[in-house]
């Protein structure tokens, strides 16, 4: 029965692969393919949800073993990273809850994104994200959890930039991606320290061996995972990224920043409860950061003018309270708080568009007079306590400068030295670019048919610039590209002059004569006398 746990993250992954391949091949494209795409995504998450419910029932009835090992992924003399999953406890409860919420979000998205240009791209990313989140909570080791952690972050980045033609969406996606990566570095460091001191990356073994770790070792491991949790769950000083994530579509906002992904950090702290209990200073830090974030979310949310930003600041504040509960040792309360908040906040984000439609024009409840009279607090709330600018100065801008320098070095040194072919820079790299190119082609065709007559279409000629652009498509750069181009030119000359142009009447006549001569030689060899002479000649040569 425990083996069924593999299907929970696997089915959404298969759905994402089918949607992606179908969209790339053109079988799932436009409004005609929406029903198939929606059916693939819905059925995959539905079956995953049912399997999760079955395993949760088996856990409550004590029919499961609590874990399942599907094999070994990495292994050496000192390191073993198995492919194992958890089928009991809070991980199973959270996986079931997330599966149910993701099923609701996918069903909601089918009508919400109907006739959207990025319909298939959205469901591809949402299915991949569902697989990543289910892997994150069900994996029995740090490596598997980190894989789900990273894939979920990548899907978050791509869905924030869903409207990639809008500069604000693309910029906010980049900001969120860079900010969360700072926490991912600490996650990797925590895995390394766990292996260095506990000789394991398995969660259950790490928790069991936490009593043998010194206070300093346990504190270092707990601190690394705590910083990763702060970044993923939008705690100070990483909190501002959550408001920037509002650029994505409403269903993805609900799945990522309302109901599911933002709780990953709290889950990580709950998962490592024994390790954190061995590190009292880190638990105190978790409590302080949670309290400050709760205050920050409450005050900043008072001055927001749109419903999604208000909900996201409220989410950040509630997550801060969960970290405060973990820091105070109220682990059970934090678990219940997480589950309840995921349900409530997911519903609020999904119903936000409908709410705005029904309460349009109604005044909102004013803040208390005491708070309203604090001008400095009002200014700080409008500026979001200047944390966004501080994060820009110390994190985002240095990373952008470094990436700009690396890109310049790659373009002007590496590419010219290696001769990277230009098609690698010009081909379609994302589903979004492919959709954009298809839409542009359709619009160009429609405008041409509407303005230009059929006679003008027949007389249309390709300009020299277009011809040169087409010819330059497969042209390489650098020494290697130049050498390849010259060799290709020689081979083309040989093919054109000696093969293509050489096939004329003379070549056909020569071929016919050669065939007749070969037939005569064959008839002579088949003559018994000549055949005997030929055999004797070969024997004499051999002797």
What are these regions (language model features)?
Residues 1-415, 419, 425-450, 454-481, ...:
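...captures the hydrophobic TM-helix bundle architecture rather than a specific catalytic motif
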């Amino acid at each position: 029965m425990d083996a069924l746990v593999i299907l929970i993250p696997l089915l959404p992954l298969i759905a994402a692969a089918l949607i992606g391949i179908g969209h790339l091949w053109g079988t799932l494209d436009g409004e005609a393919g929406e029903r198939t795409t929606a059916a693939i995504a819905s059925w995959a998450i539905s079956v995953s949800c049912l399997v999760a419910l079955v395993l949760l029932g088996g856990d409550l009835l004590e029919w499961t073993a609590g874990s399942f090992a599907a094999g070994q992924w990495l292994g050496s003399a000192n390191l073993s990273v198995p492919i194992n999953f958890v089928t009991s406890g809070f991980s199973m409860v959270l996986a079931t809850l997330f599966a149910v919420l993701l099923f609701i979000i996918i069903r909601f998205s089918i009508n919400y994104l109907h006739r959207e240009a990025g319909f298939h791209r959205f469901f591809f990313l949402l299915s991949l994200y569902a697989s990543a989140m289910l892997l994150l909570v069900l994996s029995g080791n740090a490596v598997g959890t980190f894989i789900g952690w990273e894939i979920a972050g990548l899907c978050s980045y791509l869905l924030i930039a869903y409207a990639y033609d809008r500069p604000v969406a693309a910029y906010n996606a980049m900001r969120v991606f860079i900010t969360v990566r700072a926490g991912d570095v600490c996650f990797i460091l925590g895995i390394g320290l766990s292996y260095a001191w506990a000789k394991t990356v398995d969660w259950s073994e790490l928790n069991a061996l936490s009593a043998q770790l010194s206070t300093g070792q346990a504190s270092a491991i707990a601190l690394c995972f705590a910083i990763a949790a702060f970044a993923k769950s939008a705690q100070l000083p990483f909190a501002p990224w959550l408001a920037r994530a509002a650029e994505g579509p409403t269903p993805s906002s609900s799945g990522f920043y309302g109901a599911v992904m933002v709780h990953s950090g709290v889950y990580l702290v709950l998962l490592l409860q024994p390790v954190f209990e061995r590190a009292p200073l880190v638990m105190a830090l978790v409590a302080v950061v949670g309290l400050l974030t709760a205050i920050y979310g409450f005050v900043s949310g008072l001055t927001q003018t749109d419903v999604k930003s208000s909900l996201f600041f409220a989410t950040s504040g509630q997550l801060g309270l969960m970290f405060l509960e973990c820091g105070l040792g109220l682990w059970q309360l934090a678990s219940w708080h997480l589950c309840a908040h995921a349900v409530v906040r997911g519903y609020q984000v999904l119903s936000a568009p409908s709410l705005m439609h029904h309460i349009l024009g109604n005044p909102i409840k004013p803040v208390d007079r005491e708070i309203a009279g604090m001008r400095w607090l009002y200014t700080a709330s409008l500026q979001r306590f200047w944390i966004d600018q501080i994060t820009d100065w110390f994190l985002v801008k240095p990373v952008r400068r470094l990436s700009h320098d690396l890109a310049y070095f790659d373009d002007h040194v590496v590419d010219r030295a290696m001769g990277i072919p230009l098609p690698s820079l010009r081909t379609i790299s994302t589903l979004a670019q492919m959709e954009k190119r298809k839409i542009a082609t359709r619009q160009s065709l429609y405008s041409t048919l509407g303005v230009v007559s059929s006679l003008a279409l027949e007389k249309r000629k390709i300009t020299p610039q277009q011809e040169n652009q087409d010819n330059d498509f497969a042209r390489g750069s650098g020494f290697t590209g130049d050498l390849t181009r010259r060799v290709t030119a020689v081979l083309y000359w040989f093919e054109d002059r000696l093969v293509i142009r050489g096939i004329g009447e003379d070549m056909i006549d020569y071929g016919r004569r050669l065939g007749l001569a070969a037939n005569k030689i064959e008839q002579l060899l088949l003559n018994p006398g000549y055949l005997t002479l030929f055999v004797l000649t070969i024997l004499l040569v051999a002797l």
